[in-house]
Amino acid sequence: MKIDILTLFPEMFSPLEHSIVGKAREKGLLDIQYHNFRENAEKARHVDDEPYGGGQGMLLRAQPIFDSFDAIEKKNPRVILLDPAGKQFDQVYAEDLAQEEELIFICGHYEGYDERIKTLVTDEISLGDYVLTGGELAAMTMIDATVRLIPEVIGKESSHQDDSFSSGLLEYPQYTRPYDYRGMVVPDVLMSGHHEKIRQWRLYESLKKTYERRPDLLEHYQLTVEEEKMLAEIKENKE
């Protein structure tokens, strides 16, 4: 995968040199290039200006973005604009982006963008219902969530298939050694070696956690007959 990032602050992306994303780059599975669009700005390198019609704040000018975009070697990329008004990013979106060969992220600052910048864009994406100083942190979050889904980046595909949200449910509780730590012991079923009982326990706990913490996820989740029975039991126990 090739990722190009248009930003005023390339140095902010140093975390992408480490952990899973860094290893993906070392393996040659990922190429990330940074483009400081201030370097392409005309008018004394100014990248922002006052909005027509008045108003508070400054807007990111179209010219530096267009010229930086034109300078990128590309074929048919998904072009992502980080915008609080965009569609909210989630695991399904990360899985979709992981199928792409080329991604371009446009990270803004200031009050907003000249609307004409959006003619370059295929996706307007937000992390959530809040405003960040710039798009860099949002871009890093999306890149991390996406890159770890690329085949061969994580050793076992099942490692991320069991993650929260990948199945539509929150992930079940997990434990490792020691068995007893400060009086807190591992559930007996996990020590039993009985794979079917372990599967059932994990499914029950996933449903329980989702029901308690993110019941909204269940509105779009297609329950199996087994899951319907478990969820009914969970609800009954909560009453």
UniProtKB/Swiss-Prot annotation:
The protein's name: tRNA (guanine-N(1)-)-methyltransferase
Chief location category: cytoplasm
GO BP terms in the entry: tRNA N1-guanine methylation
Entry superkingdom: Bacteria
Positions with a binding annotation for S-adenosyl-L-methionine: 108, 127-132
Family indicated by similarity: Belongs to the RNA methyltransferase TrmD family.
Its EC number(s): 2.1.1.228
Record organism: Streptococcus pneumoniae (strain P1031)
GO cellular component: cytosol
Signal peptide location: none
Keywords: Cytoplasm, Methyltransferase, S-adenosyl-L-methionine, Transferase, tRNA processing
Top-level EC class as recorded in UniProt: transferase
Location within or outside the cell: Cytoplasm
Enzymatic reactions: guanosine(37) in tRNA + S-adenosyl-L-methionine = N(1)-methylguanosine(37) in tRNA + S-adenosyl-L-homocysteine + H(+)
Gene Ontology MF, one: tRNA (guanine(37)-N1)-methyltransferase activity
One family name in Pfam for this protein: tRNA_m1G_MT
Protein's job: Specifically methylates guanosine-37 in various tRNAs.
Oligomeric form and interacting partners: Homodimer.
Lineage, top ranks: Bacteria, Bacillati, Bacillota, Bacilli, Lactobacillales
